[in-house]
Amino acid sequence: MPKDVSPSHFAKEENSLSQALAIKHRVCIQNQPPTRCLSNCAPGTAVVQAKREKYSRKNNPAVILMEKVIAAKKASNLRQHDYYSVEKYDKLSFALSDITPKVFEEGTFKAMPFLKEHVETSPETGKLILPLSVDETVSQEIYRKKQNEKKSIVKGQRTTGMNELIDTGDILASMLQDVFTEVNIYEDDIRFVQSQFLSPIASNGAISFYRYFIEDTTYVDGNKCIQVSFGPNNSRDFGFTGSLYIMADSTFRIAKADISIPIKSTVNYVKRINIAQQFTQLPSGEQVLAKNDMFVLLEAAKFLKTLEVKRYTEYTNYSFSPLSDRLFRFRGNTKIEPDAMMQEDKFWAQHRTEQLTKSEDQTSLFVKRIMNIPGIKPFIWVGKSLIENYVPTSIDEEHPSKIDIGPVNTMITTNPVDGLRFRASAQTTANFNPHFFWRGYLAYGIRDHRWKGMGEMTYSFKKKAYLPMEFPTANLTFSYSYDVGVPSDQYLNTDKDNVFRALTWSSVKHMMYDRSFKLIFDREWEDGLQWKTQLRHSQTEPTYHLFYQPVSHAYQSEPGQPYSITPWGPGSGKNIANLNRNFLTITDLSMTLKYQPGVAYINTKQRRILVNKEAPIYRISHTVGLKGLASDYTYNLTEIGVRKRVWLHSWGRMDFDFAAGAQWNKVPFPLLIMPKANLSYVYEDDMYNLVNNMEFFNDRYAQLMFNWNLHGKIFNRIPLINRLKIREHIGVNVLWGRLTDKNNPDLEQNRNRDDIFVFPGEFQNGTFKPTGYAMNPRIPYVEASFGIHNIFKLVHVDYVRRFTYIDDPAITRWGIRFMVRVIF
């Protein structure tokens, strides 16, 4: 062993390699604090005393060795071949951990004596566990070099256990698969626990990010190997730790890897991760992954039970034979064979490379026994309602829910026009009809005494499992709605009358009733392409402090005086009813094209959750106003946009969202372009935090929204604060806007026009004070946010500051926004 490198320095400095326990190759750690044993311990194993030294990369044999390993990676790149295919078996299991015999004798489990038949001992922890769900997938991965195309064909898919209790059944498995993705160290960047980790053998950056130590020589499958331990420079950064077993020959191939994360890692809810990887050499010389055995121990809080997640993946039958073009003839990256979910036991016996345990094989029986417990169904019904935000009308497996009531968080809320607002909502499910769907709501405001509502009928050309929004869509929808709101409501990711949105930082005084009919065709393809066409007829009615007064009807300064315009209001002596327009009626046709390669969603009852946020999103839309077709105006609105996420390894991630657009015709202010104003204290992604309702009006705009989550890169280096595991967030929103002369009501050239309206404002003691303006094209709107995220692993708090357009005393220059979000 080289004398200039302390083999135990890394353990002393990190105290984290004790977590690098191979799943089937247990590592022994000696009781003496400053000592360790990294290899598989056996009688006579040497124990090395830790000695603290300064780490140096210069002339470091471990670093020199790793540079050779990294350089040799190219020889194992399967994409050098014209074709390749491989069979893949994947098993994902989820279990309740740390079960003790005592729990069966008291409390809730006392009424479930059958649970004793379903528990088993975890080989990783030695404790009793209760398997809750098992998901298995058999697939074939195929690749062709000419088109640089890699795809997956799913031949078998099987789900048992707790997933059967969730109506959108794939949500649990999809979330676990998205969080605990496959780890392949031969890839430079590894997406894991919804973040990006740098591989210890990444071509760029690994040598500077990790520290390496030569530990020992050992044998793996009869091959002499050099064991190298590794870990990040800062144990709180998002990085791996563990050991690599490198072939002691000129190929520098990796035979085995034991991977974990540091004890001090700021990854949330993860108490322990162990990943054991085995590699094999193909006859053609490439070193490829053969088995990936992952074990994760989750802990949400100290007072709660821990959970075990296991993911076992095995690759077999590597082949470089030519593949038929027919195999690649499907859109998207994944194709599920029609009979994949109907495979019989014979298929699984043939393709299952790791047998299920007795308890794993009985997870369906376990769920049935749970459901047969007297009095249990009301508790399950309440639990499902709280988790899914919808109340199912049945939880009987033989008669599943055909109608779900909800969302629950919209039943009671408030706004300035409605006052206290009550809403009843419901939607049908695929159990009613897998092609025809209905959803709607009825609401009533105590203050305005008006009934509002929405009804929507959808026909899905594709058979759905539960809801029509499941990806990919091919839906024809007709809807009618009558409700009150503000223009920014259309940009929200949640329902506009979500009870939490009632907490507004700005006094909302300009609202409108909107009665609209929509006919929508929405088509998505597996490769990420989306086409949406909408025909809309809408009639808006201003309410509260909002009014539609044509410029020609407003008071204007006398000839010879500087031009100014002021609307007539209460106390003016004018008949306001004759001056103001009661309604604005439009009919328009819009077309939207969006492309997001590699798109993937998790389905919930309320919305789809985008999981592959690394892929860019390109979008373009155009809307045409159809005057004469029950419409007051002709107009053309064009918008484009692109969104991209960039990972910076240990420095976190940056999100960029750019958009631009133009309203080409003469239109009143309700048809101009207004910023996406978030009026709530609850933080919303991709919205302006300090722009007031209807504050800016543009017919040309460009905007950039930037967010940088640093993953604790700075806080992790501050003593004491680093123990809190909080993370930094920086955001900047910039809006450039311009209003052309033809749409500016404040210009004298428009004084006689009745097709544009005076901008919104309010009357104070008979004096009109405008609250909406045209932006100065030389001065962009700029706001920034500085946040502390991951407080108690849930709460995000941001300080937001506005830097331009701050001369008006009524403007709010700064504020605090918050949100609750579960992240790893």
List where the protein language model places each region:
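Periplasmic N-terminal soluble interaction domains immediately after the signal peptide in Gram-negative
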Residues: 1-59, 272-274, 292-305
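Amphipathic hydrophobic-ligand
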Residues: 204-209, 236-242, 267-276, 306-312, ...
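Extended lipid/amphipathic-ligand handling interfaces
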Residues: 215, 242-248, 274-284
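Hydrophobic lipid-interacting interfaces of membrane-associated proteins
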Residues: 91-94, 233, 262-264, 280, ...
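Short, hydrophobic/aromatic-rich segments at coil-to-beta transitions
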Residues: 83, 221-229, 253-258, 286-291, ...
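Exposed, low-structure sequence patches enriched in small/polar residues
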Residues: 196-198, 320, 330-824
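Short aromatic loop motif centered on NTY/YTY
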Residues: 261-262, 267-312
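Structured extracytoplasmic
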Residues: 52-225, 231-239, 301-406, 410-413, ...
